């Protein structure tokens, strides 16, 4: 069993903000698989599809680890079978990469997942949102994408959803090789 969790903030107010790219990818996965997140736990909603769980916390970003831990414990999923999708300010808009482990940097949602799981040993799908040096980070990540920015991001979100679906039946190293290399070549 594998767990795929998109990080974001709940509510329509945050739907198309930079911090919610993880939620946007989960929405696309559900659309592609024709499923809904129809099961509830204390800290979020999820769907079970074949041999994996797709989930979104209903807590704010900084408390995302509660739901990841709740699902990992309930379904007995090891941290190395968890994939967390999140925004990455240190990647330019449209860049993305799969990574195994490592620190959470300044991303409070990822830091909370690390803290709650008590390990960095889980997979991440990082999606670049870029930075704006003239704006405080907390304001920037809660800003909605412009139409121009979203047109750059949309194909990346679609590809990320496809990668997550493939994660359910492929080795992560195979996906990293294929996806990260493809992104480097611009194909």
Curated annotation (Swiss-Prot):
A Gene Ontology biological process term: protein quality control for misfolded or incompletely synthesized proteins
Keyword Methyltransferase listed: no
Signal sequence, start to end: none
GO cellular component, one term: cytoplasm
Listed Gene3D superfamilies: Peptidyl-tRNA hydrolase (3.40.50.1470)
Sites where the protein binds tRNA: 14, 60, 62, 108
Site (Discriminates between blocked and unblocked aminoacyl-tRNA): 9
Localisation per UniProt entry: Cytoplasm
Primary site of residence: cytoplasm
Assembly description: Monomer.
Name the UniProt record assigns to this protein: Peptidyl-tRNA hydrolase
Organism: Mycoplasmopsis synoviae (strain 53)
Classification lineage: Bacteria, Bacillati, Mycoplasmatota, Mycoplasmoidales, Metamycoplasmataceae
